[in-house]
């Protein structure tokens, strides 16, 4: 696994020494040797690499990585260029268009958001090929909870976008009055029509950031 080497390291270094993480590290390393896992090992911590702690303005929480070949690259909801856009991201783009008038791109790579301060964090960072949730409960949740708590302790304006019940369960960890929590149903085709569409998370996020003197996010993904 590629090491975290920016300011997230200081925030999370205590986790690396805990028994659960040592067991997690051993389990994941062994499975990368003996099974097909996603994302590629070097991409596991991409969300942290691309969005240092001091630059985080927005947090979007996902669950576990995409589990088909070539999709996952360490950012929740995002896929590499050249890969079919997954249904949930199709709906995110639709809401982005309806909310801000952004042009819908022909790819699903959201790196531009991450580089502007949108931490796109799955709560579980690895998955076995073609087996959704196969690494749930092996330790990643404890690790990403530590990241969420580190974010909660930051006193600058941060927006937490929580789509769906699993993400919304993390709201109990968020009690900083300087932050904004936006909740909506998951953008999955199974639930998007229950209130995800029309929730306007992108404009609400930028309005909150601007009110706090923070430069808003340019949500337009390059075409």
Where are these regions (language model features)?
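Short, extreme N-terminal leader segments that mark the start of a protein/domain
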Residues: 1-10
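C-terminal substrate-binding/active-site "lid" region of AdoMet-derived donor-dependent transferases
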Residues: 196
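A polyanion-binding, active-site-adjacent surface
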Residues: 2, 14-162, 166-169, 174, ...
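Polytopic transmembrane helical bundles with strong interfacial aromatic enrichment
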Residues: 199-200
């Amino acid at each position: 696994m590629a090491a975290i080497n920016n300011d997230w390291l200081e925030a999370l270094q205590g986790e690396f020494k805990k028994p659960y993480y040592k067991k997690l590290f051993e389990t994941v390393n062994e499975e990368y040797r003996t099974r097909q896992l996603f994302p590629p090992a070097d991409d596991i911590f991409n969300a942290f690499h691309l969005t240092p702690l001091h630059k985080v303005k927005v947090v979007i929480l996902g669950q576990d990585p995409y589990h088909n070949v070539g999709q996952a690259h360490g950012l929740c909801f995002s896929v590499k260029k050249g890969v079919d856009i997954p249904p949930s991201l199709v709906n995110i783009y639709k809401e982005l268009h309806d909310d801000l008038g952004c042009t819908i791109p022909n790819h699903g790579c959201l790196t531009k958001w991450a580089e502007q301060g949108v931490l796109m964090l799955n709560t579980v960072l690895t998955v076995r090929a073609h087996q959704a949730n196969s690494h749930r409960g092996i330790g990643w949740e404890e690790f990403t909870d530590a990241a969420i708590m580190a974010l909660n302790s930051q006193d600058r304006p941060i927006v937490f976008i929580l789509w769906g019940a699993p993400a919304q369960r993390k709201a109990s960890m968020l009690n900083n009055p300087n932050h904004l929590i936006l909740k909506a149903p998951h953008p999955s085709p199974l639930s998007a029509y229950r209130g995800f569409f029309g929730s306007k998370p992108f404009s609400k996020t930028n309005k909150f950031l601007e009110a706090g003197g923070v430069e808003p996010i340019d949500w337009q993904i390059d075409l």
